[in-house]
Amino acid sequence: MATGTLAWDPFVGEHADADANSDTADDENLPTFYIGHHEFKRPLPVTEFVLRQAGDVGYDMLTSPITSPHFHSRVLSLISNHIAEISAIDSSDAPNKATPPAPIIPPLDPVDTPFTPSDTVSQLIAYSSPWIDLCSPDPLVANISRQVLNIEIAYASFCGVGNVIIPGPRTHNGGSGNNGLAQYARAIQEALAIASYINVSIHMPMYGVEDQTEMTGDLLPFSRYQSTTDTSKGENEIDLYENWDAWNLIRDVCKYNSRLSVALALPRQLPIESLQSRWFAEPLKLLTFTQSTFLKNKGGHPVLGKAHQNLLTRYMKLKNPPWLLLCDVGPIPGLDDPNQQISVADGYAPPSVVQDAPSPTPAEAEQARRNSTKSQTKSKDVAAHLIYLRYLQRNQPERTPIEKFGSGYQDYLQAPLQPLTDNLESVTYEVFEKDPVKYDWYERAIERALSDWVLQKKPTSSLSGAVVLAVAGSGRGPLVSRALKASQTTGVPIEVWAVEKNPNAYVLLQRHNKNVWNGVVNVVKTDMRAWKGPLRNAAGPIGQAVTTSSTTPATTHGKVDILVSELLGSFADNELSPECIDGVQHVLAPEHGISIPASYTAHLTPILAPRLHADISNRFSADEHATDTPYVVMFHAIDFLATAVPDHPQIQQAWEFSHPLPVKTLHIAEARRGGGVSGGGGGSMSGGDGANEHNTRYARLKFVCKDRGVVNGLAGYFEAVLYEGGGKAENKVELSTRPDTIDAKSKDMISWFPIFFPLKACISFLGLYYYELLTYE
């Protein structure tokens, strides 16, 4: 919460608080609400005194119209004169009745606008004229409306305004697919081109028609054409997705411009959760509240229903939380009398003021909405709505550890790692090592594998009877430490081999072996696929130094009982885990050897991700392969399109890999790699000699999308079985990144973000849609 003098920079969307003692704003565990005040008939101009008074009450920002009533009157006179001229021509007896072109609005005069370049302007959100009609079927009204918008946007940009709100398309001109909406979208596209640095927010209701304040001088009555209406719907029937369809067309015409966003008007009765989730995925700049959005509690104070509170909590967890705008809830207190005693919205309020009110039925909500448009009821406190929102801010739930960790990663595109090609830096290893869940689960898998090994009385591959365990791709050694701990916990002795190709990590592993592991680990620097197995010195004990000279006694290579690796990628196999484990399987004991992980599966689902699509589209100019590249992303502002119920996506398995491979499969692969006759001569359908043909996968998946939407790409996840459990289901150890199973299998795991496969051409669909996916690996 911010109090005191406003100091807001609209270009970066940050607010500076003059009151440095505001503990709520400094609390990193709670979201900060930036709350603005909007009046349809705000007294002009908005002076420094008005801004200061608003800041003293607790507002962070104010809106202001770009042009004045004088400009409005001038435009109306221009239209009236032009229509009169047309009428005179039509009523004359002249043989050639050529219709004159639409008049051109003269440039602004000082009396036409309250704005001038100054610090005050930089602290305002501009609101374009609501009396224009960009959707009008009348070419004259549409032309004049477009001129007004362009004049306002150009002048606001000149003055240094950073954010402009434009009223959404009027729905009285027909459905979302009509020509009027296309006109509106092109007008917005033109406005964005005129002002290269202004952020434009389209003010739209979540569904239905927004409460319209009666306007004197509306251009609608000037239309000489009857507007078309959608007669296919009943009088009281509402198409819940109609407004989203309109927004989708606008941003599609504007090519997902990063400066285009939504100012979403919240109704008194919230729609179904699937529509709430759809808007959650969109670039929300503001959430707007009118008096009709609020309920009245027993004390007569405005409060939000539980559903609105939950929605606000969810939306405020976005990477860039929307600002909140109170619309026509009363004037700013103290403007008429600076000495007036006013309440300050500091987040503290008596229980009677913030006591919840029962949620209304749909009929009650509609009646309240109609009543609110007829008469504005006054609250007991002129700042009551602001006081309540500040109370909600102070009482927001703290962010969870996962939310804190992911705050900088939400919807941020990252290239998948290539550990086989690149030698990772220490800081990269460190990030993954911060995830205790993954390593706890690996340790649990090793513990159960060791315990079952003893219970099942399996022979070991060492002369001492210790279970031989190798960590293939040891990195900085976290799995080695967990393996030693598992041995200590179970009391089962192990012989540990740490294999690592990264020469820099190899240095650290040797240091750990000396200072942390007491020299009990055998550290080997090599690519795991080239490793021949544990070194066995015919004349010496197990664990002899790895590096030998020509005078060293003859050595042999033994087998490994348990092979541990952490080569999984966000889509299971996308970091070549199958190829790497196949390449080292020759060292695994053929009869009793265990691979951890034992198997893993890849999973897919279609999603709407407009923010990610916009980001990738912006990269395309510099990187022509941007749309062909998969990205690792911590998904947040997305909408699952194939769902059984809201927020419960239908995610389908694409394919599976298991380890160890059957010996016969390995022999065929080796024969093909060596060009042997037994390997055949057909090669591979994906090219090459066919040695990796056994890792080729194919999937055909079908998804049912119930609601209208746009497929921007595919979300990819994986599940892995680290240890099968030795025949006991309760001993099974699994990992998952799927949002519907992660809590049951590996809650709070953060090592892997999902993967995003973008579509070069988005797929739009209306109503029930069957999305069929054909994919190869």
Briefly describe each language-model feature range:
Residues A2-S426, E433-K434, K438, R444, ...:
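Class I SAM-binding transferase module
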Residues E443, E447-V454, L484:
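Generic structural signal for well-ordered alpha-helical scaffold segments
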